Amino acid sequence: MSNGNRRLFIMIDEKFIREAADAYLREHGYESIKLKAAMFDMDGVLFDSMRNHAKSWHETMAHFGMDLPEWEAYMHEGRTGAGTINIVSMRERGHEATKEEIADIYAYKSDLFNKCPKAERMPWAYELLQKVKASGVVPMVVTGSGQKTLLERLNRNFPDVFQQDLMVTAFDVKYGKPNPEPYLMGMEKYKAFVRKCGGTAADATVCADGVSHHTSEALAFHSGGECAPWR
């Protein structure tokens, strides 16, 4: 994509975001939205890595006698590895995978993924994160990834942006996306961060990307705030 086309894309996207935000303010009678934190997914948002994940999942499941088409892997974006494995196992075999099977399958998939071409960071992602941080909004990561080198990889590609106590990974959650648990965990980590810095954490409005109506309601209920589904 040329720089000119990228600028046009950003302008169009910014116009859409402003219109959606204005409509939300009118609907709820608010004067403005004061963002305190922004939660970013990693694969497909910060890194252009979904094609590698899709290929690795497809080949891994075939190796273990199950079928997961590459296109379907995109539908499981954000899930924990165990969550994806159990969905396929239930469909293909009629039962969930054992803990030992999950460990073996995920290790095989991780090995294939690590052999794929290096996934570059998304165009303009670093510039966006710098702008977010400069505006006083706290950038966070909420990902289903269980990579042990996650923080090092983020710091190498996005220096001086993220910190470990403001990250939610597969190691922090039981259910994973699309369950609201990772976002709720992110809100709790943000509140703990604010308290550590000597501040107070007020109720939040959650802007949820691509979540279902029921997930939106769950986020709003458990957070004590509101949830604006972002589609």
Question: PLM ranges: what are they?
Answer:
Residues 2-10:
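Short, Lys/Arg-enriched N-terminal segments with co-localized hydrophobic residues
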Residues 56, 84, 149-152, 216:
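Phosphate- and divalent-cation-binding pockets in alpha/beta enzyme and binding domains
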Residues 77-115, 123, 131-134:
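A metal-dependent, Asp-based hydrolase signature
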Residues 201-231:
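Acidic, Mg2+-coordinating phosphoryl-transfer loop and its flanking beta/alpha structural elements
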Residues 62-64, 88-93, 126-140, 144-174, ...:
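Substrate-recognition/cap helix-loop segment adjacent to the acidic, metal-dependent catalytic center
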Residues 24-34, 114-141, 148:
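Short, acidic loop-to-helix structural element flanking the phosphoryl-transfer center
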Residues 12-72:
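Active-site neighborhood of HAD-like aspartate-dependent phosphohydrolases
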